[in-house]
Amino acid sequence: MSAVTNTLVHDLFRAIDSREFERLREICHPDVTYERPGYEAFSGIDRLLKFYREERVIASGDHLLTAALVDGAFGACWGRFVGKHRDGSDLDVEFADTYEIEDGRIRKRKSFFYRPAV
């Protein structure tokens, strides 16, 4: 297990939860791909940033990680997201992510939720 890449997963959620989306340029590979239920895959860092800034249905909240495991170029994490939808409703959702890591950055992320299209 690599402490550097484990930190990368935690850094990803800190940047997202604090809405410091520009930090994702340091954390994610320029050619990042992100797959999540309810959306077409996001390809490239600029497309990912557009999603977080303009399209995401989540207004605010925190990812509470139960665990993050990384082995070489692959990783996974799971936990719970607690926050607010843009419509004002409360969110409390279990999730799991898988990662592919290239050149010290997240190259591919795939999210799984225990409810439809969060």
For every predicted segment, state its role.
Residues 3-4, 11, 15, 35, ...:
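A beta-strand edge to alpha-helix "cap/lid" segment located at domain peripheries
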